[in-house]
């Protein structure tokens, strides 16, 4: 049993280890076979799925955009959001200047075929999550498809998004989660190690193997 309120929790492991399944269980896309996940002391199995989903903001590796303006894309699913809130979120993630150089600024049309880089798409999704202002955040593989320079920008934006919230981070690049309050190491669907970055390196187990292999391959 563990309590993770207002903490940054990283979930790591090789491909197929069960990281995404863990996130799906948190959000009740899947049902638990045993055990419980509680939010504010209430088992998620006793909550409506829509209520569980509303508690999470998500930043995914495969970001999606719909036909509409930048403003509409960022304010998606949040009635009553003001222009000021949208622009404030974009300033925090570093998108405001770029959007204001466009012909119609925030009212420029945007769709899934727009020539945005992978990093810009992720920054837009982070701005969307900031506007959504959910108490918990899931960052799923959020820096695996961007170059190192863009990764720094995305990482700073994610850190701002996660501040003051409970956050769950799944990342291929373990350098991005060294500051996590808790790291869960998964293998074949089970949590096999847990602790901080320093604690897990000291154990010399699977986490150290994962971490070391990334730097050996550079």
Residue locations for each model-derived region?
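Extracellular interaction modules
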Residues: 1
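ABC-type nucleotide-binding domain
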Residues: 4-218
